[in-house]
């Protein structure tokens, strides 16, 4: 899980979602997981 000030989809499998007011990227590739913070 990377924590970045700006989250962007890396590949075409990445999905940008909102959970509890946080913007997150979920993907089949676990290395692409990101959270804004």
UniProtKB/Swiss-Prot annotation:
GO function term, MF aspect, one: structural constituent of ribosome
Cellular component GO terms held in the UniProt record: cytoplasm; ribonucleoprotein complex; ribosome
Keyword Ribosomal protein: yes
Stretches assigned to coiled coil: none
PANTHER family referenced in this protein's UniProt entry, alphabetically: 50S RIBOSOMAL PROTEIN L36, CHLOROPLASTIC (PTHR42888), LARGE RIBOSOMAL SUBUNIT PROTEIN BL36C (PTHR42888:SF1)
SUPFAM superfamilies for the chain: Ribosomal protein L36
NCBIfam families noted in UniProt: rpmJ_bact
Family classification: Belongs to the bacterial ribosomal protein bL36 family.
Keyword annotations from UniProtKB, A to Z: Ribonucleoprotein, Ribosomal protein
One Gene Ontology biological process: translation
The name this protein goes by in its record: Large ribosomal subunit protein bL36
Organism listed in the record: Mycobacteroides abscessus (strain ATCC 19977 / DSM 44196 / CCUG 20993 / CIP 104536 / JCM 13569 / NCTC 13031 / TMC 1543 / L948) (Mycobacterium abscessus)
Short name of any one Pfam family annotated for the protein: Ribosomal_L36
């Amino acid at each position: 899980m990377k924590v970045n000030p700006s989250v962007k989809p890396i590949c075409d499998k990445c999905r940008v979602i909102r959970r509890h007011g946080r913007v997150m990227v979920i993907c089949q590739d676990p290395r692409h997981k990101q959270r804004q913070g």
